[in-house]
Amino acid sequence: MGRWVGALSVLVWLSCPAPVEAAGVREAAVEYTGSEGAMPARLYIPEGGGRRGAVLVLHGIDGPQPVIEGFARDLAAEGFVTLTPDLFSLHEFASEGRVDHPLILGDLAGALAFVKQLPETHPVRIGVVGFSFGGRLAVLAAALHPEIRAAVNYYGVASYQELGNREVGGRALRSVPLTERVSAIRAAVLIQHGEADQTNPVEQGRLLHVALTRAGKRSLLYTYPGADHVFNFAGSRHHAEAARLSWERTVAFLREHLR
C-alpha cells in the first residue's frame, strides 16, 4: 500500500479496492490528525494540474453516509478538492450530546490543516459545506477559523434555545447560538432551507441570515417551498426541484469565493 507522509498527516491511497476513477476524480481513504489521534476521512481530487480550492463536506447527525460521499465526489467533479471527515466513529460521547463538542471541533481543525497542506490545494481557498448537524458546524467552523472563505449551511440549527423543543437539552441547550458568533465570521455564508422542514424549521435559517446581514456580513438565504429536511438526498423527503436549485447555487457560490 502506497503512502505519502507529510508533516501533519498520512495519506493512504486505496489498494483494495483500487482508487475510484470516476468523472475525472481520484478517490482515496485518508487519515489526518484529530483530537484523539488519527481520524478517518475520504478525499476526492479532480484530475488536472494546478492548485484548487478545497471544501470540507460535513455529515449530519447520522454520521458518514453514501449520499455525503456522493455529494463530495460530485463537487470534486466540478473542480474542487473535497474531504469528508468522519467526526463520530472514533469518539465516545457522553449522554449530554455532540453539539459543539470540543472533540469534534478539534477534528475539524485537523481536517482544515490537512487540506491546506495538500499539494493539490490552494491553502487560502478553503470552504465548508454541511448538512443539518454539519450545516451548523460549517458556520461554526467559519467563526472559529477566519481563513475559511465560504460556508454553506444546509438546514442547520442556528439556535437550539430558539427551537422551543422540549427534547433539546444537555450540550445543545448550553451551546452558544450561531447568531452570537457572527461577528467573528469573515467567510461568505450561503444558507439553504426547506420551507416545510419538520425537523428544523425554516425560521432557523432566517434567524441566522438576519443576524449575519445586521452584522454587515455576506449572507445569502434561499428557502424552498414544499421542501422538508434533507430535501436534496434520495428518500421519502426528496424534493427534486429544491435539490437541483440548491446544488446549482452551491456550486456557483463556491466558484465565486474559492477560485
Task: Give the role of each language-model region.
Residues G63-A72, L87, E203:
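The serine-hydrolase catalytic nucleophile loop
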Residues V67, R98-P119:
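Alpha/beta-hydrolase active-site loop
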Residues G216-R259:
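C-terminal catalytic histidine-bearing segment of alpha/beta-hydrolase fold enzymes
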Residues R51-G60:
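Short beta-strand element of the alpha/beta-hydrolase
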Residues A76-E92:
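Conserved alpha/beta-hydrolase
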Residues G110-A184:
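Primarily recognizes the serine-hydrolase "nucleophile elbow" in alpha/beta-hydrolase
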Residues I185, I191-H193, D197:
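Short beta-strand/loop motif that positions the catalytic acidic residue
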Residues V20-G49:
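N-terminal cap/lid segment of alpha/beta-hydrolase-fold proteins
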